[in-house]
Amino acid sequence: MTIIEVKIKKLENFSGNLPAYATEHSAGVDLIAANEQTILIKVGSIQLIPTGIAIALPDSFEAQIRPRSGLAIKHGITVANSPGTIDADYRGEIKVLLINLGKKDFLIERGMRIAQMIIAKYERVLWAETSILTETMRGRGGFGSTGL
């Protein structure tokens, strides 16, 4: 496993501890809500939740914002644009777009673990335009073409 250094800035609304891995083999760190007041997410609605942090990722890395499984299974709270992408050149506050797919309104309290963030390396592509693609067994079979 490679460990990279990522610079992190605590903003004025920051609360609690820096994002941390819950276990030795956790892929993501928990993001904490840094809202000044309780935020109500009504059933079927979306709210933007501040985290109070900004980061500076190295080139060729992104941060992916993903749901926390406990919030999803217990309350129907998930990340609306999952996975959300934080680009390496973004320096603003990381915010999480949460949606309530549950059956009850849900309150986001300051200090609550609201999402997880995974740092991932990515590659850039150089498109090679062509009029013919190589044949495969699947071909152009799309949704459901490989079975249920």
Swiss-Prot record:
InterPro entries tied to this protein: dUTPase, dUTPase-like, dUTPase-like_sf, dUTPase_trimeric
CDD domains to which the protein is assigned, alphabetical: trimeric_dUTPase
Superkingdom of origin: Bacteria
Keyword terms, alphabetized: Hydrolase, Magnesium, Metal-binding, Nucleotide metabolism
Cofactor: Mg(2+)
One BP term from GO: dUMP biosynthetic process
Catalysed reactions, as listed in the record: dUTP + H2O = dUMP + diphosphate + H(+)
Binding site for substrate: 68-70, 81, 85-87, 95
GO MF annotation terms: dUTP diphosphatase activity; magnesium ion binding
Pathway(s) the chain acts in: Pyrimidine metabolism; dUMP biosynthesis; dUMP from dCTP (dUTP route): step 2/2
EC number: 3.6.1.23
HAMAP family according to UniProt: dUTPase_bact
Record-stated family: Belongs to the dUTPase family.
Function of the molecule: This enzyme is involved in nucleotide metabolism: it produces dUMP, the immediate precursor of thymidine nucleotides and it decreases the intracellular concentration of dUTP so that uracil cannot be incorporated into DNA.
Protein name: Deoxyuridine 5'-triphosphate nucleotidohydrolase
Gene label: dut
